[in-house]
Every structure is written in structure tokens, then in C-alpha cells.
């Protein structure tokens, strides 16, 4: 199919949500909840596993979501960064003809959010897609001895997020929540980002306890630039 045919076939801009978080933060479990809510609202969604590894275990964990209103796609890893970016762009172009209302992207645990926005503003993706929500998951018991590179990535993941969620918050005391929040703000300061968070701005809840108001908050949280 030619690109001009794809462009004609896309009637409305498709929103893309990016779900970020380090390995173990609970991205896959959260996506199952989030995607299930979207499907209950009658949305047709595509989930794209943008994995830099050679084997994608998360894809297996999400398989029970597949059906008429949900499809799973994957970008295979095992290549260099430039090759992976090309595959990412090609996959999104192909997905534009699938009639999705929304696409959810789960990148690997190491991902620069700027690359997400850079890709969406390139042609021809800017004709098909627009940024939806950027949701950042942070382990409430986050270790406070991250490497300089990991701390930078942590800051980039939350800096543009429309909503930050603390995962496993029911497993740690409030003192630890405050310590994680402080570490998060330190990471932002070190990359010269002016944004800071207070605890009441963080969605701190077990995924099982998310209610209608929480889902609406997530669905409309957007992103910050």
C-alpha cells in the first residue's frame, strides 16, 4: 500500500499514550488495567511493545487482552538505536490503517521520552498521530543510589508526564513515599527542570483500587512540555 493511500484512510488523528517506568515499576500490569478500561468505553486500541531487548516477556503477559477491540504489536529488539527508531516509525505507519482510536506504547525500561515526541512530529507520523497522555510509573520504594544515567532517565520520564503514579505504594510506609518524592524532585533539579511535585499531585494507589474518577484523571492527564 502506498503512503498516500494510508493518508486517505486515516480520518481522525489517533492519540498515542506513552507509559514509562523502570523495569519492575509495574508498567505491564498497569497497562492491562488501563487498556481494559478503554475497551469498556468502546475504544479500539493498539498496544505497541517498543522493546530494546531480543525477547519480550511483556508481550506474553498482555496476550489475554487481544480481541476485536485490542491488538498487540511488537518491535523486535536486537539491533542498534538507529535501526530501532526506523522500525518504530515503520510500525506506526502500518498501524495507522488499523482503525485504532488510541495506541498505547510501552517502551523498554530504558527510554528517552524526547525520542517519543521527536518521532511523532516527523512526517508522515504527524499526519496520523497526536500525543495523548504521558503516564509515568515510579516504584514507591525506589532505590536512592541510581547511577547518573538512570537518574537522568528518571527525570526525563516524569518531566513531561501528565500524571505520575507511585506503584507498590501499599507496600511501603508514608515516610518512604516522601523519600521517593524528594529523590524524584532532586533528579528534576539536577537536569535543570523547573517542575516539582508534591505528594498530593501523585496518584498513589494500588492498581486494584483505581476507580472511575482515577481512570478519568488518567485518560485526560495529557502531557507537559
Kindly label every feature range from the protein language model.
Residues 123-129, 154-156, 181, 185-190:
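A short alpha->loop->secondary-structure connector
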